[in-house]
């Protein structure tokens, strides 16, 4: 099951309608906000010191890198975005930003993000940022998204790298701690995305994007969500057992994980309106945010100074 980019007529571009808000929307601000937060937590957990100004530059570069990838993703996916209810109000589809402008904006933003990360922070963080942008655009968006049922699983590497970038920005290294942060997001991504696919199944079928519910069916998808949720529960406790976080983290993250498992199990009793899938999707966002807030607030190692 696959689809290629199809030429579409987005109508006449009215440049006078373009606003700063449209360019912010082009960068996928909801995704970018989570990227910024997880990247910052990665910096905070690194057992080294860094000047707050340098830390600020690193956060801005991570944000711009995420925005760059989001803009280029919207440029490439403009054909299927026009067919999906969830994405029909994106700037390119609405005709307020021209597709070529979106591509140029994404490329320029990405260049400056990587350049200033290398110039002001360190080369490792810059390389990881460049790799993340490349992976999200080339591996996930262009190659996997329309061709593989494992698009979200393999493509999730890019979304899981921001805390590793943040950690490297402070420490100039990759450690077990940053790998665990990576694993938490990497394992969280499939159940989160498949829950969305459950209640947007018709859209994905219409666009011929091989999301798991559209290819394997809803029951198989729900089983996979439960499996990944169990793995996530296990991995989410690891920060305590390697000494990253204290006992409070273990207790609260354990409770959050049990609730996550409850919502995953409730999918098997979902109604035709996908009420449980929507609840699980909403909770999964809260879960990841709160887990990283816990990682930030209950850490037992050095912080930015």
UniProtKB/Swiss-Prot annotation:
Subcellular location per UniProt equals: Cell inner membrane
Q: Per its UniProt record, what Pfam families does this chain match?
A: UbiA (PF01040)
Q: Transmembrane as a keyword?
A: yes
Q: Which InterPro entries match?
A: Protohaem_IX_farnesylTrfase, UbiA_prenyltransferase, UbiA_prenylTrfase_CS, UbiA_sf
Q: Which organism is it from?
A: Rickettsia conorii (strain ATCC VR-613 / Malish 7)
Highest taxon listed in the record's lineage: Bacteria
Disulfide-bonded cysteines = none
- What membrane topology was assigned to this protein in its record? Multi-pass membrane protein
Cite a GO CC annotation. plasma membrane
Q: What's its catalytic activity?
A: heme b + (2E,6E)-farnesyl diphosphate + H2O = Fe(II)-heme o + diphosphate
Query: Additional info?
Result: Carbon 2 of the heme B porphyrin ring is defined according to the Fischer nomenclature.
Copy the pathway line from the protein's UniProt record: Porphyrin-containing compound metabolism; heme O biosynthesis; heme O from protoheme: step 1/1
- Stated family: Belongs to the UbiA prenyltransferase family. Protoheme IX farnesyltransferase subfamily.
Q: Where are the transmembrane segments?
A: 31-51, 52-72, 96-118, 123-145, 151-171, 179-199, 225-245, 247-267, 281-301
Q: What is its main location?
A: membrane
Q: What is this protein called?
A: Protoheme IX farnesyltransferase
Question: What is a GO molecular function of this protein?
Answer: protoheme IX farnesyltransferase activity
Keywords linked to the UniProt accession: Cell inner membrane, Cell membrane, Heme biosynthesis, Membrane, Transferase, Transmembrane, Transmembrane helix
GO biological process per UniProt = heme O biosynthetic process
Mind telling me which PROSITE patterns this protein's record contains? UBIA
Q: Does the keyword Transmembrane helix apply?
A: yes
Instruction: Tell me, in a sentence or two, what this protein's role is.
Output: Converts heme B (protoheme IX) to heme O by substitution of the vinyl group on carbon 2 of heme B porphyrin ring with a hydroxyethyl farnesyl side group.
The Enzyme Commission number assigned here is 2.5.1.141
Residues in a coiled coil are none
